[in-house]
A protein has these predicted regions:
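Hydrophobic transmembrane helix bundles of membrane-integrated enzymes that assemble
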Residues: 1-178, 241-331
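Long extracytoplasmic/lumenal interhelical loops at the membrane interface
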Residues: 56, 187-260
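Short, intrinsically disordered terminal tails adjacent to the first/last structured region
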Residues: 329-339
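Juxtamembrane membrane-water interface segments immediately following transmembrane helices
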Residues: 155-205, 218-220
Length: 339
């Protein structure tokens, strides 16, 4: 029971809605501006550590060099939201508006993450099309778009032709099914993730109750977990040398399927997509477009990141929910401080 409480503490963030809904528009704006400044500072540090190879932020143990840039994966936790906030709802004006947005955009690219880079560009282009009502408005965002498209071309040209296509070929030929025969290395990241999900999916199919609702919220490294699971696909625990059985930062779907099962995962996705649709329908309201794009980015990168799984990533959508419902209030339109 204690282990379940420890594992489920993240779900308490869902209760933050009842606190956040009491905030006024001015209080929300002030909080967001402060958090935006914090993320900008974190993004600067993250970019510096990429070029210097010196860890400046916590959680920087795992990294590898990629010629000019050292790849770190400890990017700011709130970056995914505030990169869109900086583009579409930036509280600054003049050159500071563009500099602050550019800092966050550069931070998105620094991990040299293929799926994140491509997903971000595609979603940003979608956001610009949803945002603009006229060609003149699109031209205002054109410099920002060009800054994003140029790295995309480089990433697609240099990496999609090699590693990505090899990964896709391995997955489409079904190599992940023969889990014990998989040889994972630098060139098989997508194959690793699919195999990781597949092994856990096959496990829950062994019992009807787990097929429907998953194996539960047991903690990693607990006695129960060590007895119940014996997965062979996963990262190695540096302390014990054993394979990490439940937790993974590589793919959200493994966490979802092993914890919630098929029905539980479908319920979670139904709620998540309903929130996305809500913000899409109200995208003219301030912060709604940024929130929709943020949720879409979490969904797009769910095969290479675990952030979709964590309830605390929904704090911003919960914060804006009530004020978005007041869409007829002219003070809440997307036009203020965004031109």
């Amino acid at each position: 029971f204690v282990e379940i409480i420890r594992t489920s503490r993240y779900y308490l963030f869902a209760l933050s809605y009842f606190v956040l809904r009491r905030l006024t528009k001015e209080e929300i704006s002030s909080i967001l501006k402060i958090l935006f400044c914090i993320v900008i500072f974190q993004s600067i540090l993250f970019t510096i550590q990429g070029f210097t190879g010196i860890a400046l932020l916590i959680g920087a143990e795992s990294h590898k060099s990629a010629k000019l840039i050292t790849r770190f994966y400890n990017s700011p936790l709130m970056l995914y939201f505030f990169v869109f906030y900086g583009i579409f709802n930036n509280p600054f004006t003049g050159k500071y508006k563009y500099i602050s947005a550019l800092i966050c955009i550069v931070c998105v690219y620094m991990p040299l993450h293929r799926s994140l880079t491509i997903s971000f560009i595609l979603i940003l282009i979608l956001g610009l099309f949803l945002k603009m009502g006229k060609i003149k408005q699109f031209i205002n965002y054109l410099p920002m778009l060009l800054l994003c498209v140029i790295p995309l071309v480089a990433v697609m040209g240099a990496q999609l032709a090699s590693r990505t296509m090899n990964d896709i070929n391995s997955v489409t030929t079904g190599e992940f099914v023969d889990i014990e025969e998989i040889e994972l290395g630098e060139e098989s990241t997508l194959l690793f993730r699919i195999a990781h999900f597949y092994e856990r999916y096959m496990h829950i199919l062994e019992k009807p109750i787990e097929t429907a609702f998953g194996s539960g919220l047991m903690a990693e490294e607990s006695n129960y977990t060590n007895k119940k699971f014996d997965f062979i696909v996963g990262l190695e625990n540096e302390k014990t040398g054993e394979i990490v059985q439940l937790e993974t930062s590589d793919i959200a779907w493994s966490n979802l399927i092993i914890r919630y099962g098929i029905i539980g995962t479908l319920i979670y996705l139904t709620i998540y997509i309903s929130i996305m649709i809500f913000y899409y329908k109200h995208r003219k309201v301030r912060y709604a477009l940024s929130t929709f794009l943020y949720l879409l980015l979490l969904l797009f990168t769910s095969i290479t990141s675990n952030q979709l799984y964590y309830v605390y990533m929904l704090v911003f959508p919960l914060m804006f929910f009530d004020m978005t419902l007041e869409k007829n209030n002219p003070n809440l339109t997307n036009n203020e401080n965004e031109e």
